[in-house]
Amino acid sequence: MKVTGSTNITVRKLIRNLEKSKKPLWRKVAEELSIPSRKRPYINLYKINEHTKPNDIVVVPGKVLGIGKLDHEVTVIALDFSKSAIEKIRASGGQAMSIYKALETFKDFKGRSVRLMKQ
């Protein structure tokens, strides 16, 4: 069976842009997005809450779901968010940002604690 990659055109363009950035973090995210969508991670907020400290940046190469709550401020960068996840992230004082926007906003993460969460 031939491996074709993502069939979603916007995800394919995003993968290309991430690979062009030449930053190790964005290249790893591009590699994670290249897997089939059924194998992409779905991360709940309680997992993000467990594994982060205040003012951390979390990158999720999949979808963030709204189960659980955040008790500290976190910037979450993901391919997709559920509505409840966005509301809870903002209620805790954090920021929910798409990978598209983060690629333009964050040129480098010097001095910031960044975590790539897959499961």
UniProtKB/Swiss-Prot annotation:
Pfam families on file = Ribosomal_L27A (PF00828)
Domain of life, per lineage: Archaea
Q: Which GO terms describe its molecular function?
A: structural constituent of ribosome
Keyword Ribonucleoprotein carried by entry: yes
Transcription as UniProt keyword: no
| Alphabetically ordered keywords of this record | Ribonucleoprotein, Ribosomal protein
Output the Gene Ontology cellular-component terms. Answer: ribonucleoprotein complex; ribosome
GO BP: any one term: translation
InterPro entries linked to this entry: Ribosomal_eL18/eL18-A/B/_CS, Ribosomal_eL18_arc, Ribosomal_uL15/eL18, Ribosomal_uL15/eL18_sf, Ribosomal_uL15_CS
Query: Family assignment?
Result: Belongs to the eukaryotic ribosomal protein eL18 family.
Protein name per UniProt: Large ribosomal subunit protein eL18
> What species is this protein from?
Saccharolobus solfataricus (strain ATCC 35092 / DSM 1617 / JCM 11322 / P2)
